[in-house]
Structure formats: C-alpha cells, structure tokens
Regions:
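N-terminal auxiliary segments of SAM/dcSAM-dependent transferases
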Residues: 1-48
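Class I SAM-dependent methyltransferase Rossmann-like catalytic core
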Residues: 45, 50-71
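Conserved alpha-helix/loop element of class I SAM-dependent methyltransferases that forms part
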Residues: 65-83
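Class I SAM-dependent methyltransferase SAM/SAH-binding core
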Residues: 86-88, 93-139
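A short acidic, Gly/Pro-enriched loop at the edge of an enzyme's catalytic core
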Residues: 138-149
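A short glycine-rich, Lys/Arg-flanked "PGG" loop and its adjoining helix->strand segment in the class I
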Residues: 159-171
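Conserved beta-strand signature within the Rossmann-like core of class I S-adenosyl-L-methionine
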Residues: 170-180
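Conserved Class I S-adenosyl-L-methionine
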Residues: 212-256
C-alpha cells in the first residue's frame, strides 16, 4: 500500500527483510520498533524535525491521566468507524488517538508523522498499526483512494492530498483547537473554524460540527507537561496547580 517517496517515483514499495524497496531500487529502512522511514533528506528543516521526545513524553502523560479522554470519545463517535474501515491519521504524533481507536474497533490503521521520535513511540505502543515517518505536507506516500477515513487532529492540513487518498464518499475528521483551549495558560486563541472550513471547500462537504470541552484540575506536574507539549517557555515560579480548559472544534467532512 505504501509508495516510494523519492520525487518523481511514487512506485509501490515491497518488503525486503528489514527495508522497503521500490522497482527502481530506492530503499527505506524499517526500524526495530516496526515503523518505516520514508522521509527524504531535503524534507528535513532540522536535524530532528517535528515534535521533540520531551514534548511527546509530556503529551503521553496527559493522555494517560485521562485529560483528553472526552476528545477521544467524541472523535470515535464522529467517525463511527467499523472493522471494515481503512483509516489514516495524518500528523499522528505518538499515535494515541489512532492506536486506541484501532484497539477498540479493529480497523486497518495507518499513521504518518514527520517526527521519528513520535512515530517510534507510536510503533512501540500500538504495533497493530502501520506507522510511517514522512512529511505529510508533501505528497502522501499512498495510492489514490486508499482510505475510507482520514484524521487530522490538531496537525497541519493538506486538503488536496487528503482528498486524493480518500475514497469517494469517505469521511475526513479535522480537529482544531477551539478559542478557549488552554485559555488559562496561553490566553484566548483565534477562532479558525470558518477559515478551516473554507480550506476544504473544494472536494469536501461539511456534514457535522461540534465543540468538545472539559475543565480539569491539574497539579503542577501536569501543568508543566501542558506547557512542554505546546512549547511554552517554562518559568518555575509560574508552574503551579491550575484548573485548565481542554477544548477542540471537530469538523466532519465527506469527500464529494
């Protein structure tokens, strides 16, 4: 199902022991944890692009403590996936949403992210899914109409590529931070709902919209994890227990 990520190639990849190879002999490593690295050298804007290991660990602790559980349940309800679905999480991070939903539903799951550290964590925790390191801002390494569902959860969006890999009538779930998300830590945010809907006007129809919010009492260590996960500078004197709002805008589209 994977395609070669070398520019101008895009031929199907086949497994050859610990690597993936295309008919033109372009080769890609399979890590010990099981993920496939398709990231091209010219696509690296930094030595280790994407989320840092520290941010990934902080986000994982927040997930494990249940602060984002209502978001996960709302996403599951919105996409209504079954075991027959083929699901792509573009910008999957540590794999929390895709991995837990796959465990519950048994669908064919594929996650892609530019951060090798994030994808490695996902592969170790959720080995039933296929995990790929690649730049989702570029051409996605999948054939046309490969997926029945695509997820884009607080990540970068690539509307034309989402449409290309999504089957006709397939579902796209886009989650963006609501204006009151983490308002106690970073102030009120911009409402990007209308702008996001406009980006998907070509090739998609908006079929549902829902805001999912909850407030939680965080101890100082959890507040620190939130700050690290959103790359805010840490000041020891300001890291104290606080009641914090977690809020997402869920936009469900159908491929036209």
């Amino acid at each position: 199902m994977l395609l070669c990520s070398v520019r101008g190639c895009h031929l199907s990849l086949a497994r050859d022991i610990r690597r993936m190879v295309c008919p033109r002999k372009h080769s890609f490593d399979i890590a010990r944890s099981g993920y496939i690295n398709l990231l091209q050298p010219q696509e690296r804007r930094a030595k280790h692009p994407g989320d840092t290991a520290e941010a990934i660990a902080s986000r994982r602790r927040l997930h494990d403590r249940g602060y984002t559980e209502n978001h996960r349940l709302a996403i599951a309800e919105a996409i209504s996936a079954t075991s027959d679905d083929v699901v792509l999480d573009a910008g999957c991070g540590d794999g929390y949403y895709l991995g837990t939903l796959q465990q519950e539903t048994g669908f064919d799951a594929h996650g892609i992210d530019i951060s090798a550290a994030a994808v490695d964590a996902a592969a170790r925790r959720y080995p039933e899914c296929e995990w790929v390191v690649a730049n989702a801002d570029r051409r996605l390494p999948y054939p046309d109409q490969s997926f029945s569902i695509v997820l884009s959860i607080t990540g970068r969006m690539n509307p034309s590529e989402f449409r290309r890999v999504l089957r006709d009538g397939g579902r796209l779930l886009v989650a963006i931070p609501a204006p009151d998300d983490l308002i106690e830590l970073r102030g009120s945010g911009r409402d990007r709902t209308a702008q996001t809907v406009a980006r998907f006007a070509k090739g998609f129809t908006l079929i549902n919209q829902r805001r999912v919010s909850n407030c939680a009492d965080l101890d100082a260590s959890a507040v620190r994890d939130v700050l690290v996960s959103i790359y805010r500078p840490l000041q020891r004197r300001s890291v104290e227990a606080k009641r914090v709002t977690f809020s997402l805008e869920l936009l469900l589209f159908r491929a036209a």
